[in-house]
Regions:
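Nucleic acid-binding interface residues in structured DNA/RNA-binding domains
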Residues: 3, 9-12, 17-98
Length: 98
């Protein structure tokens, strides 16, 4: 498990979210590196039939929802985003085991 995966798992199990900036600082990464790693993780999660762990990230704007790029990538991976807030809520619940 990578440091990114471990941090996302810790947040998910606690039912918490984190901003992209805070996560990048926690890991000591540049934002571009974090974004690329999250997109690769989303691809792997989708391929393995797992909830998207990147859903625990929250943009600075948007009421605690992930940034636009999360939704663009999820749509490209074939997820139904007709109810974005519901999709994120269901995904976060699945990740936290609740």
């Amino acid at each position: 498990m990578t440091r990114l995966e471990a941090r996302l798992a810790e947040l998910a199990s606690a039912g918490q979210t984190i901003t992209y900036g805070a996560l990048a600082r926690d890991l000591g990464w540049r934002m571009a590196d974090l974004t690329a790693a999250l997109e690769m993780l989303m691809e792997r999660d989708a391929a393995e039939g797992h909830p998207l762990r990147a859903a625990v990230c929250a943009g600075r704007l948007g009421a605690g929802l992930p940034a636009r790029g999360f939704f663009d990538k999820a749509a490209a991976l074939g997820f139904d985003l007709s109810d974005p807030e519901g999709f994120v809520a269901r995904t976060r619940a699945a990740l936290s085991g609740r």
